Amino acid sequence: MMITRGWEGWGRRGARGAGTGTGLGGPGTPESSVTPPEFPLPPATRITPNFPNTLDPAISRSSS
C-alpha cells in the first residue's frame, strides 16, 4: 500500500501522477514528483516498472 501511494505521488506512470501527485507529491507535476524529498522510496523506483499492470492496468495502458 505504501508503494502504491508512493509511485502515485511520484507520477512515474504520469497518468495517475498528474492527479494523485498533487496530494502526495505536492507540486502535482508527474516529472517533478518523481523523487520528492518528502518520502524517498528507492525500492519503489525499481519495483514500479516491474508490476505496473498488477496495481492498476489503466496506468500501464494510459502511459503507453
Curated annotation (Swiss-Prot):
Q: Where is this region: Disordered?
A: 1-64
Q: Where is the composition biased (Gly residues)?
A: 16-28
Q: What is this protein called?
A: Putative uncharacterized protein PRO2289
To which species is this protein native? Homo sapiens
